[in-house]
Each structure stands twice: as C-alpha cells, then as structure tokens.
Amino acid sequence: MSDPLSDIEWRVEPGQVQYRTALDAMDARNAAIAAGDARELIWLLEHPPVYTAGTSANAAELLDPRFEVVEAGRGGRYTYHGPGQRVGYALLDLRKRGKDVRRFVHAIEDWVIATLRTFGVESWSVDGRVGIWTKDIDGAEAKIGAIGVRVRRWVTMHGFSVNLDPDLSHFAGIVPCGIDEFGVTSLARLGISLAPEEWDAALQGRAGQFLAQLEGEPL
C-alpha cells in the first residue's frame, strides 16, 4: 500500500514563525503548486502572539488590539494565534481532488476531531458556527480549535489551529470568529498536558484518512 503522504511535503517548524512570514510563504507556495512547480504542503508551526483578520472581519469585534493585527486573506473573522497553539496549514491541489471546497473544509474538521479523540477529547463541528467545539471544565460548550481557509487557483491555503496550552486571556482582545456567546478552552485547561510533537505525530497518523476523505471516501 502506497504512502498517501509520499507526494506531499510534511513540514514541522521547530520554532515560532512570524505570521507575515508564513503568509508570504503560503502565497509563494500556492502559486508554485498551481503552476506545477512545487509539491503540495502540510505545514505545522506556531506563531508569536498575533490577531488575524479574515475577509469577513468586523472592526467592532477587535476589542483590545494588544498584539499586531494582520489581514490574513482567509475566510472568517478575527482569530488569535500564539505560543501554545498548534497551527496547521494545508496547501493542497483541489484540481485533482474534485474541486470541492466544502468537502475540503469538512475533511479538515474531521481530521482535527479524530486527532483530539486520540487524547480522550470528544469534539465536534456545528453547522453555522465555525470551529471545533468541546465541553469545557464547567460543562459549557467552548471552542478548542479554529478553521479558516482560502482557495486560490484551486489550491488551498491556511487551515486550522488547535489550543494545546496557549494563554487563553489573549483571546479576550477579540470576539473569536465573531462568536461571543461561547468561551475558548484548551487541552491544558481540560487537564491534558501535550507536547507539540505528540500532537503532530497523532495528526500525521490520521493524514491518510484525511486525504482519503478529500477523494470522497468517509473518514
């Protein structure tokens, strides 16, 4: 059986990457993939504290811009990235995967949900409410992961973030993804101590299922 990742670069960044640097790198790689000059890429990394604005961002939801605010070009509204949060960028060519953006988003969601389940965390997506959700320590529903994508020339950009152990107070500077009636949580808040390497390995272990789902197979 062939390795589903054999034609895809799997890159794990050892240190923090400035958000603008990552954005420029994604733009260049997107163009190269679309032109047939580069392999597809799944990129795992961490950013210094930053607020990013999606194409639907509402300035009223930027409550306290204590960190740099960067226009991301992805769909969605404001989100926060910072230390303790694992970010995954997927630059994949949908021209050979049915050109189905909705299926791509659902596959990303299911990939994150399946990986969280590895560590005993049940999570879910909700129609009309962007993100990955779980039950917080007080029993209330809270966001543990964010989803935001862009597709240009049928090549995807951006992807997801999952809260391993970020400073959750940093989310108070925005209304995360425009949803103010729910809180934000993390694996650490749920009592699970997890190194980024452990998360990355579990995610990679489910990458084949994620790619199969992009081909139209159920996860």
UniProtKB/Swiss-Prot annotation:
Cellular component terms per the entry's GO annotation: cytoplasm
Cited InterPro entries: aa-tRNA-synth_II/BPL/LPL, BPL_LPL_catalytic, Octanoyltransferase, Octanoyltransferase_CS
Protein name per UniProt: Octanoyltransferase
Catalytic activity: octanoyl-[ACP] + L-lysyl-[protein] = N(6)-octanoyl-L-lysyl-[protein] + holo-[ACP] + H(+)
NCBIfam families: lipB, PRK14341.1, PRK14345.1
Family (UniProt): Belongs to the LipB family.
UniProt keyword annotations, A-Z: Acyltransferase, Cytoplasm, Transferase
Residues with site note (Lowers pKa of active site Cys): 143
Function: Catalyzes the transfer of endogenously produced octanoic acid from octanoyl-acyl-carrier-protein onto the lipoyl domains of lipoate-dependent enzymes. Lipoyl-ACP can also act as a substrate although octanoyl-ACP is likely to be the physiological substrate.
A Pfam family per the record: LplA-B_cat
PANTHER family xrefs: LIPOYLTRANSFERASE 2, MITOCHONDRIAL-RELATED, OCTANOYLTRANSFERASE
